[in-house]
């Protein structure tokens, strides 16, 4: 009995075709034991029937062409992102087919912990569809179905960030597609793909495999960790960007990592409204996450940055942005309750990239083509010479204080005490730790009154 006849089992191909390593193992078993063929075909038929039943149950009845979705998989239909202005159904269906169809499986990593858009363990896959378009997608291993994904040409930013406040070192890979950075909407007629976040441990990639089923750890030039391995793979696949990681030359928090002693922290804790998150200051922009909606403030989308609500222990960062797809659309984002300990580092970062001056936005957009975020020596000199408006305000307060001391009135002590009490109540309300000792902060006399200072 030839191996060719085994490969002609259509029911096995249908049931296990999307999982090529498993399909290959089945055929190898059949080649060694041909008498098992009826059993494997019965299993394949049962699996195929389950897949058909699941697909029919999950599919909405007769969806309209304008509601075609670029992401298929389990989950409530309202959570699926629709194609913007979906009249371009030919292009939409092509993108959808490329993501879900059988494709050349190049690399897969089992049991990855995804946080966005779904919080579950899935199999990460990198595939190549007909036409040489490569996809990054996530497969439900139990149902053998694609949950979500994105074509590599549609990926705008890829970040690899340390997970804050964990006892064990971990990294989050963040995939930000075009039209889903939280600032610029997709172009009319273009599909909108989900942002994707998954977590990897700081260890060898034991669950990573080549498309043939060979463990990736057998590779001679394999990186030692999940982070290094996936970063090198993604950099190889990405054509117009690269994986961006935190850099000490850009920003390091003044507050060390609390759960891993001696390790530097690259994040800043902040709030957007009532939602707590982490801000990372990177070489290509500012990221805020890790909960939906993620926001990435690319340099070419930032009009200006200012500081507001400057208190004894905290301040707010206001980022004015302009959409790249709709230049008339501007919006301001406020990241609040940032610890004053991180002000010097944040201010140095803002000046380094000249984000404080809206008149320089065109120059920043021109430099955005350089994804390495490099800048010339003359720009550094300008940044160093640019004086912080917050420090100017502080000196003005000091001068005013000197003048008040000359006209000191003992009867004013009560007002001064009241101001200090208000400031302490403000701090106690937010429950922040006092990192202010020994720092050059806005004078405590400012109390709970917020001063808006634009950089």
Swiss-Prot record:
Belongs to the RTT106 family. This is Histone chaperone RTT106. One of its GO terms (cellular component) is chromosome. SMART domains: Rtt106 (SM01287). Interacts with histones H3 and H4. Gene3D superfamilies: 2.30.29.120, Pleckstrin-homology domain (PH domain)/Phosphotyrosine-binding domain (PTB) (2.30.29.30). It is found in: Nucleus; Chromosome. GO terms for molecular function: DNA binding; histone binding; nucleosome binding. Residues 51-93, 371-455 are annotated as: Disordered. InterPro entries: PH-like_dom_sf (IPR011993), RTT106/SPT16-like_middle_dom (IPR013719), RTT106/SSRP1_HistChap/FACT (IPR050454). It comes from the Eukaryota. Residues 398-416 have a biased composition (Acidic residues). It comes from Coccidioides immitis (strain RS) (Valley fever fungus). Keywords: Chaperone, Chromosome, DNA-binding, Nucleus, Transcription, Transcription regulation. Pfam families: Rttp106-like_middle (PF08512). Histones H3 and H4 chaperone involved in the nucleosome formation and heterochromatin silencing. Required for the deposition of H3K56ac-carrying H3-H4 complex onto newly-replicated DNA. Plays a role in the transcriptional regulation of the cell-cycle dependent histone genes by creating a repressive structure at the core histone gene promoter. Residues 55-70 have a biased composition (Low complexity). Residues 374-397, 432-446 have a biased composition (Basic and acidic residues).
């Amino acid at each position: 009995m030839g191996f060719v006849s085994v490969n002609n089992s259509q029911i096995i191909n249908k049931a296990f075709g999307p999982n090529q390593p498993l399909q290959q193992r089945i055929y190898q078993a059949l080649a060694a034991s041909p008498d098992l063929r009826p059993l494997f075909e019965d299993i394949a038929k049962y699996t195929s029937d389950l897949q058909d039943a699941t697909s029919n149950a999950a599919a909405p009845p007769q969806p309209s062409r304008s509601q075609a979705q670029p992401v298929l998989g389990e989950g409530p239909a309202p959570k699926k992102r629709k194609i913007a202005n979906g009249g371009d159904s030919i292009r939409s269906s092509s993108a959808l087919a490329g993501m879900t169809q059988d494709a050349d499986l190049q690399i897969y990593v089992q049991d990855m912990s995804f946080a966005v858009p779904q919080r579950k363990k899935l199999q990460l896959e990198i595939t190549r569809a007909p036409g040489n378009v490569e996809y990054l997608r996530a497969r439900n291993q139990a149902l053998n179905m694609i949950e979500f994904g994105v074509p590599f040409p549609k990926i705008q930013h890829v970040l690899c960030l340390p997970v804050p406040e964990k006892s064990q070192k971990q990294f989050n890979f963040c995939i930000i597609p075009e039209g889903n950075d939280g600032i610029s909407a997709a172009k009319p007629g273009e599909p909108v793909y989900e942002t994707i976040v998954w977590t990897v441990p700081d260890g060898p990639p034991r669950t990573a495999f080549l498309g043939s089923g060979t463990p990736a750890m057998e590779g001679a030039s394999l990186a030692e960790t999940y982070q290094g391995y996936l970063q090198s793979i993604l950099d190889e696949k990405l054509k117009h960007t690269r994986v961006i990681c935190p850099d000490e030359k850009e920003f390091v928090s003044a507050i060390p990592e609390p759960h891993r002693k001696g390790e530097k922290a690259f994040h800043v804790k902040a709030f957007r409204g009532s939602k707590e998150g982490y801000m990372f200051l990177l070489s290509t922009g500012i990221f805020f996450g890790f909960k939906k909606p993620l926001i990435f403030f690319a340099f070419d989308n930032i009009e200006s940055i200012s500081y507001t609500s400057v208190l004894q222990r905290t301040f707010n960062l206001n980022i004015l942005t302009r959409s790249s797809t709709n230049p008339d659309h501007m919006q301001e984002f406020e990241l609040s309750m940032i610890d004053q300990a991180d002000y010097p580092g944040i201010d140095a970062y803002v000046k380094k990239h000249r984000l404080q001056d809206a008149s320089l936005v065109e120059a920043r957009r021109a430099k955005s083509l350089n994804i390495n975020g490099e800048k010339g020596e003359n720009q550094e000199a300008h940044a160093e010479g640019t004086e912080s408006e917050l420090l100017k305000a502080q000196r003005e307060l000091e001068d005013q204080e000197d003048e008040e001391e000359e006209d000191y009135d003992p009867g004013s002590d009560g007002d001064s005490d009241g101001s200090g009490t208000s400031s302490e109540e403000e701090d106690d309300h937010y429950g922040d730790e006092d990192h202010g000792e020994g720092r050059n902060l806005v004078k405590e006399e400012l109390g709970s009154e917020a001063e808006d200072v634009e950089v």
